[in-house]
Amino acid sequence: MHDHEHMHGDGVIHSHPHSHEENHEHHSDCPGEAILKVDGVAFSYKSHSVLADIEVGVSRGEILAILGPNGVGKSTLLRCMNMILRPQKGAILVDNADLSKMSANEIAKNVGYVAQRSEAARMTVFDSVLLGRKPHISWKLTKEDYAMVEDALAKFGLSSMQLRYIDEISGGELQRVCVCRAIVQEPSVLLLDEPTSALDLSRQMEILHLIRHVVDQHNCATIMTMHDLNLALRFADRFVFMKGGKIYAACDKWGVTPELIQEVYGIEVDVIFHNELPVVIPK
C-alpha cells in the first residue's frame, strides 16, 4: 500500500489529500519472465496519436486486465498485440520473437484473439469453434482436433447448440463461441476484448471462471480489456490503467486505491476489501 493511504477499521482505504502525481513510478514489469512483451509501442490513426510509448509484459499463468475509460486506446492496444494493427513504433514480442516478422498462421499459433464484436457467419457453432484448430492443421483434421473441440464445447455449455447456426444464436452465446474458438487454438497468449460485454451476470461469472481455469490448466498468459472494475479485480492478477493513450499505472490488487480510480476515471470511490479482494464502490 502506498505511503499516502491507510486502511481504517471499517475496511475502507482512505486517501490522504495530497496529490498522487509524484508517485507515478508504477512499474509495468510483470513477475517472472514475460511470454508477451509490448516494447515501446506507439500507434496513430492518420495524425491522431492513440498509443504512445507503451511498455507492458505478461507472464504464463497470469491474467492481466487493461482498464480505463472509453477512448483511451485499450482495444487498439489489444489489436496491436496480434498485428491486426501494425504499430508505427516499437515491437510486440512473444517468447522474444517479433510478431511483425511472423506469418498470420504463426501469429495464430501463438496468440488467440477475441474481438469485442464478432461477426456471425453462416456456419454451425461446431464448425466455428473448429476453425480455432486451423493454424495447427497440416493436411487434414485429426480425431484429436475433433475431441478437443467437443471437450471445449462441453466446458462452455455449448454442446446442445453445436449444430445451430451462429447467426441464429444470441449475442451472449456468440461471445462464448468466440472465446471457445480462441482457446482451442492453444495459444501461448490469449487476448480478450471485453469478453463479458454481451453476457448477463451469471454467464459473466461462468466465462471468467472458465478463463481462469484455462489459464491455470494450460499455463497460458491472458490479457483482457474490461469495463467492469469489480469483475476485473476479482479475476485478474495484475492491472494496467490507461489514460490518454499511455499507461498511467500498473499494479496488483493492493495498488488499486480511491486516489488512483479518481485520477483515471474522474469519480470518487471507496475501495473496501471483502474476502481479500478489493471492491470499488462509487460515492
Where are each of the predicted segments found?
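Helix-to-loop junction immediately C-terminal to a conserved catalytic motif
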Residues: 82
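Conserved ABC ATPase "signature" region
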Residues: 143-161
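Conserved ABC ATPase signature
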Residues: 165-169, 173
